[in-house]
């Protein structure tokens, strides 16, 4: 396995670790509605950071974006909005199915859809099946899906042992939302593929290969921001017991703490895709679809490890922890299979 591929996998792991940890600061926010907290973090992660980073990278910020036609930018924006819809559905999926089943189904579907639809739509799937390296990477995708399923089973055992139930369990509604969440969340993978002309233009301007995807985030995350912030603002305006005015009328020390914690959560959220861009840059072009598989499977892996480190599994018993450990090992094996496949001609 080449150093470039190894580093690509490592950067995806670091990005996924940030994704697994980003909600920790949000949990410390007090006396704010979820909508206000999510909006403040979202403004940082979807608007401020993509714009600031792009302004630092590009020699002429406005000229870069003006150089693209609407036919190039619109699909990138719409796929970003598609991913934003998946974000909203994610929370509802957890509500009706519970954390473990919801995450397992949603992540499993988005892993498959986001990974395999791109080569299918681009007419490259036959090439992948017809080469030794392609077949090995596809095997790695399947093994990763098995790993996600095992971790999901561990979560179910944990919830059963600890008496944790879904807020409003509804299997039919939850499954529909999980499928929608999985499909729409794959919009980020599609957006990255649609943004290739933007990446190439950034490279032509002399932007380092590690950073060429970052300017496209202004458009991708702009689409996601429209959906997420729109959802939050509508709820803040229409739901009687929600009030952004009340949330910002707290005592100054608590208000500052809430803003900083939400901003930190937003920063950590952004970093997952900052390092995703680095990892994506190191993956061979013919296997760029694998970036999404690595990100999502590592997200599940890191989520399990973080849960163990935070002692969330302390009272779950030995069997759930053993099953979780097995699932994590399977995901690590999947990453190695994919890495070997990418290194095979």
UniProtKB/Swiss-Prot annotation:
Its main location: membrane. The chain crosses the membrane at residues 4-24, 38-58, 68-88, 101-121, 131-151, 175-195, 214-234, 259-279, 290-310, 323-343. Keywords: Cell inner membrane, Cell membrane, Membrane, Sugar transport, Symport, Transmembrane, Transmembrane helix, Transport. It is a multi-pass membrane protein. GO terms for molecular function: rhamnose transmembrane transporter activity; symporter activity. It holds the Pfam family RhaT. The keyword Transmembrane helix applies. It is found in: Cell inner membrane. InterPro entries: L-rhamnose-proton_sym_RhaT (IPR004673). GO terms for cellular component: plasma membrane. HAMAP family: RhaT (MF_01532). Belongs to the L-rhamnose transporter (TC 2.A.7.6) family. Uptake of L-rhamnose across the cytoplasmic membrane with the concomitant transport of protons into the cell (symport system). This is L-rhamnose-proton symporter. The gene is rhaT.
